[in-house]
């Protein structure tokens, strides 16, 4: 759908064809006797494609675009929050960052983009250099595409909770971290996640691709290291289980530290401190993954860490999350060490 949306920008297909596609996808929300996850899936498909083509549709098909957004707004108003939301949260508390459901978050981001007249800054558009040629291109009308009817055997996108670790106060003053409801935040995170999914089993290419992402983006300077760390931990802590083996995340984070030694290790250490501070409300499975990754990471740096900074854990009961995390980390460190270390 996103590919078809970008084809509108290159004048390959007409705006009307894309509007018809969006309408057919959104009409799924009006079907009877279907699971909510089906409606969520097709609404997300439309919302995630809008940033690429919303400006063009706003200029040429404003009324039709408004009608689609009003239909989505009506659906979001009557929609019930998934029962799995609390089970998928990394933290049991919304302090300091609310843990939003993925569909509610992108709807808030699209609503803010709409208020800003559909202006975004971080989508790479190489075709703008050929605008003089493309403006004369013959646009094509695509045959109507309708979603298949629901079958009990259908598998839809699993519900997700958006992981948030940093905000602008955690970043250097010279950088600007887009807000959680900024579409720029979604675009950057989505592109980094795409790079990770594409290259996760080639750690060097994956790390290089992530760090080179800003070379393709347009707009203000952003603290890319912070966004990368947040995306990586969000993938690592995904519930009920992470998409890839834990070693994928750990090895890529190591290569990121090697490729960007002046800044990335410091940002990663800052993230570890924030995670440690919030262990009290962290999901138990995520604490275990955190300890396993941290021990692996330390094993590649001679197990060096400012352990004195965590002496506060001595004041708690042994089963409190903080001393328990430290104990598990040390156990993993023992497994990863050998006599000469």
Annotate each PLM feature.
Residues 1-4, 41-50, 200-211, 224-231, ...:
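HEAT-repeat alpha-solenoid elements in large eukaryotic scaffold proteins
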Residues 2-116, 257-340:
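Extended alpha-helical scaffolding segments
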Residues 29-33, 211-219, 233-239, 253-259, ...:
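Active-site-adjacent structural elements in folded domains
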Residues 79-238, 319-341:
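Long, low-complexity, highly charged intrinsically disordered regions
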